[in-house]
């Protein structure tokens, strides 16, 4: 997946930014209160990571040293997501809800297909 920083491909950061924007767009469409937008989007990001992580090693995106995903990964991503969502809320950005839904749907669908492809379901 290209150049890496601390063992993680840079494109993963780009993907996380895209997912952050998409989850923010969906959250801000559903909720009006900033706290709910931030919390829902951050939880959605962790849910998405929960889908991606088991396949990361299989797809050779990255590997965990003990071949199991540490809970700290999900906790860290929740807090990273909170910060990203807070920035997006403070910026009062507006994104196309259809595009945001399509981005999330395509990401999740890709990984679900990979689960079937690698016999993990």
Q: Which sequence ranges carry the predicted segments?
A:
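Aromatic-rich, lipid-facing transmembrane alpha helices and their immediate juxtamembrane interface loops
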Residues: 1-121
